[in-house]
From Swiss-Prot:
GO terms for molecular function: aspartate-tRNA ligase activity; ATP binding; nucleic acid binding. This is Aspartate--tRNA ligase. GO terms for biological process: aspartyl-tRNA aminoacylation. NCBIfam families: aspS_bact, PRK00476.1.
C-alpha cells in the first residue's frame, strides 16, 4: 500500500512519485490550497492538495485529525523561504494527486494541545502511542534489544528460553500464582526471575546463556517498577566475578556509544561500605558532588547529647554534609529540609553556616555553635573541607536513620541547588555487599538472593559468623539507578545447605522447595556467575524519561491495573469452579465481585 515512510523523505526523492500511508496530524487551508501534516511511525511530512486535482481536493476538504489515509503524489523541494528546519523532512513536500480515506476518526479523547493526565493516556494507550515522542521511545527500545542480542550472540552466548509456569521459591517479593486445573489445589508461580533455571543450564553444560525475558513480582510499585518487567538475563560458567563484570561493562559501554554517541570510559569500582559511608546509598548518583563525612570521633565528648549520644553508640552515626555556597539558604528552606529528613525517621536536622572560615566561632551561624569548642569546630571544618559561604548539615541518630536521611538529603539538595551535573553519565560498580541483613522478625535474610556465594569463606566459617560474611555480588549503577545486579553463585551442596540453614529454612523445607537444586549440585556443578539487567530501566535512561511506563507499550498503573483493558477482572464463576477456587470477601467488607465469584 505504500512505497515510502513519511519521515524518511528528503531531497534525494525530489521528482519521484510516492505512495504514503498514515494519519492526518494537522490540516490547514491557505491561499486556496489544503495542507496537511501526514504522520506515520517514522515521522511527519507536509502534503498539499491543489484545486486542479478536483477529486483529491474535494476529499481533502473532509479531512480531520487522525483520519487514516493513503495518498499518492510527487515529491517537490520546498522554496528556501518555506524550509522547516524543525522537521527532518522540512526541505520537501508532497504534491498529492490522489487521496484515499481509509478510515475516519471520531474526535479524540486525548488533546494534543495540552497535557493529558496519565490515567487518560493509559486508558487510551493506543492513541497515546501515536504521539511521536512515545513512538520514538518504543523504536529506541527495539533498537536497544536488537543491539543486545547481536552483542550477546557475537560473544558466544546462547539464547535459551526458560519456563513461565514454574514453582514458587522465596526470592524476596510475592509471587503471582496460577492455579492448575489438572492438579487440583496446586498452583504454578510466574517467575520473579529465571534464576534457578539459568543455574541449571550451567549445570547442563551450556556455559554462556542469555535471555530477554518477562519477569513478575507482586510488590508495591513506584515510578521505576512494574508488576511485569523485562530482564536481560545472563549466566556464565568458568568465569570469575571480574570477568563477568568486564563483559557486561563492555556491553553497556558499546550500547551507550551506539545509541548516544557517548564514551562512558572505565567504570570505577566501589565497595558497598564506601558507598553507604560517602553517599548514604548503595546506588550513588556520582553526578552529585556532595558527600557525607563521618564526624562522630570529633563530637563524642561535646555536651550536646544529640551528637555525643550517637557518637558513643556502636550502632549510631553522626555525619555531616557540606553544601558549597549553601550559606545563602533561608531559614525557611533549612526548616523544609528538616521536615524532609523526618520522612526517613530523623528527629531533626542540625545546621551550621560558615560565614567567615578564618574567624572561628565568631564566623559561624548556628543554633548548635554554643555547644562546640573552637577546637571541635575547627576539626569539623577541616574534616568537611568547609569554606566561607558554605553550610553544613548534620545527622545524628542510629546508623540506618542517619545514612538513609542524609543520603536522601544529599540528592535533594543537589537537585534543588543545581549541583547535580545533569546531561552527564556517571556509571560505577558497587561490590562487596553484606551477605545477609536483619529481617523484621529478628532473623537474617539474604541481601541479594539465597544462591549467592560468600567471598573467601568455608561453610563452617559462614555458619559460625554469618553477619560478617561478604557476598561475592556486584551491582551496576548509572546516575543513581541500579541497572543491573549479579553475583557468583553457590556451586557446592554443603554451602547451599548452610545458607538455607542460616536463613531459617529447615531441611524438610529445603527438600520440598529446592530438592531439585540440591540434587543437581551433586553432579559436577561448574563454578558459575551471572547478572541481570533491567531492560525497562536501561531504556528509560537512554531515552531521557524518568517514568518506566513511558518505555513500555502497555504498562500497568501503580495499583498494578491496566486502565485500557480493565485488568485484573473478576473471573467467570464456571471457570473458578473448574479450578476448585472459591473467592471469599474479607471479613467486614461487602465485595460484590467476591459474591459474584463464590
Amino acid at each position: 500500500m505504500r512505497t515510502e515512510y513519511c519521515g524518511q523523505l528528503n531531497l534525494s526523492h525530489v521528482g519521484q512519485s510516492v505512495t504514503l500511508c498514515g494519519w492526518v496530524n494537522r490540516r490547514r487551508d491557505l491561499g486556496g490550497l489544503i495542507f496537511i501534516d501526514m504522520r506515520d511511525r517514522e515521522g511527519i511530512v507536509q502534503v498539499f492538495f491543489d484545486p486542479d486535482h478536483k477529486a483529491a481536493f474535494e476529499q481533502a476538504s473532509e479531512l480531520r485529525n487522525e483520519f487514516c489515509i493513503q495518498i499518492t503524489g510527487t515529491v517537490r523541494a520546498r522554496p528556501d523561504s518555506q524550509i522547516n528546519k524543525d522537521m527532518s523532512t522540512g526541505e520537501v513536500e508532497i504534491f498529492a494527486n490522489t487521496l484515499n480515506i481509509i478510515n475516519r476518526s471520531e474526535p479524540l479523547p486525548l488533546d494534543s494541545n495540552q497535557i493529558n493526565s496519565e490515567e487518560q493516556r493509559l486508558k487510551y494507550r493506543y492513541l497515546d502511542l501515536r504521539r511521536p515522542e512515545m513512538a520514538d521511545r518504543l523504536k529506541s527500545r527495539a533498537k536497544i534489544t536488537s543491539f543486545v542480542r547481536r552483542f550477546m550472540d557475537d560473544h558466544g552466548f546462547l539464547d535459551i528460553e526458560t519456563p513461565m509456569l514454574t514453582k514458587a521459591t522465596p526470592e524476596g517479593a510475592r509471587d503471582y500464582l496460577v492455579p492448575s486445573r489438572v492438579h487440583k489445589g496446586k498452583f504454578y508461580a510466574l517467575p520473579q526471575s529465571p534464576q534457578l533455571f539459568k543455574q541449571l543450564l550451567m549445570m547442563s553444560g551450556f556455559d554462556r546463556y542469555y535471555q530477554i525475558v518477562k519477569c513478575f513480582r507482586d510488590e508495591d510499585l513506584r515510578a521505576d517498577r512494574q508488576p511485569e518487567f523485562t530482564q536481560i538475563d545472563v549466566e556464565t560458567s568458568f568465569m570469575s566475578a571480574d570477568q563477568v563484570r568486564e563483559v557486561m561493562e563492555k556491553l553497556v559501554r558499546e550500547l551507550w556509544q551506539e545509541t548516544k554517541g557517548v564514551d562512558l570510559g572505565d567504570f570505577p569500582v566501589m565497595t558497598f561500605a564506601e558507598a553507604m559511608r560517602r553517599y548514604g546509598s548503595d546506588k550513588p548518583d556520582l553526578r552529585n558532588p556532595l558527600e557525607l563525612v563521618d564526624v562522630a570521633s570529633l563530637v563524642k565528648d561535646v555536651e550536646f547529647k544529640v551528637f555525643s549520644g550517637p557518637a558513643n553508640d556502636a550502632k549510631g552515626r553522626v555525619a555531616a554534609l557540606r553544601v558549597p555556597g549553601g550559606a545563602q539558604l533561608s531559614r525557611k528552606q533549612i526548616d523544609e529540609y528538616g521536615q524532609f529528613v523526618g520522612i526517613y525517621g530523623a528527629k531533626g536536622l542540625a545546621w551550621l553556616k560558615v560565614n567567615d572560615r578564618a574567624a572561628g566561632l565568631e564566623g559561624v551561624q548556628s543554633p548548635i555553635a554554643k555547644f562546640l569548642s573552637a577546637e571541635v569546630l575547627d576539626a569539623i571544618l577541616v574534616a568537611t573541607q568547609a569554606e566561607s559561604g558554605d553550610i553544613l548539615f548534620f545527622g545524628a541518630d542510629s546508623y540506618k536513620i542517619v545514612t538513609d536521611a542524609m543520603g536522601a538529603l544529599r540528592l535533594k539538595v543537589g537537585r534543588d541547588l543545581e549541583l547535580t551535573r545533569l546531561g552527564t553519565w556517571a556509571p560505577l560498580w558497587v561490590v562487596d555487599f553484606p551477605m545477609f541483613e536483619d529481617d523484621s522478625e529478628g532473623g537474617l535474610t539474604a541481601m541479594h538472593h539465597p544462591f549467592t556465594a560468600p567471598k573467601d569463606m568455608s561453610p563452617e566459617q559462614l555458619a559460625a559468623a554469618p553477619t560478617t560474611a561478604i557476598a561475592n555480588a556486584y551491582d551496576m549503577v548509572i546516575n543513581g539507578y541500579e541497572v543491573g545486579g549479579g553475583s557468583v553463585r553457590i556451586h557446592r551442596t554443603e554451602m547451599q545447605q548452610t545458607v538455607f540453614g542460616i536463613l531459617g529454612i529447615t531441611e524438610d523445607e529445603q527438600r520440598e522447595k529446592f530438592g531439585f537444586l540440591l540434587d543437581a549440585l551433586k553432579f559436577g556443578t561448574p563454578p558459575h556467575a551471572g547478572l541481570a539487567f533491567g531492560l525497562d530501566r536501561l531504556v528509560m535512561l537512554l531515552t531521557g524519561t524518568d517514568n518506566i511506563r513511558d518505555v513500555i507499550a502497555f504498562p500497568k498503573t501503580t495499583a498494578a491495573a491496566c486502565l485500557m483493558t480493565d485488568a485484573p477482572s473478576f473471573a467467570n464463576p464456571a471457570s473458578l469452579q473448574e479450578l476448585s477456587i472459591s473467592v471469599v470477601a474479607k471479613k467486614g467488607t461487602t465485595d460484590a465481585g467476591a459474591e459474584e465469584n463464590q
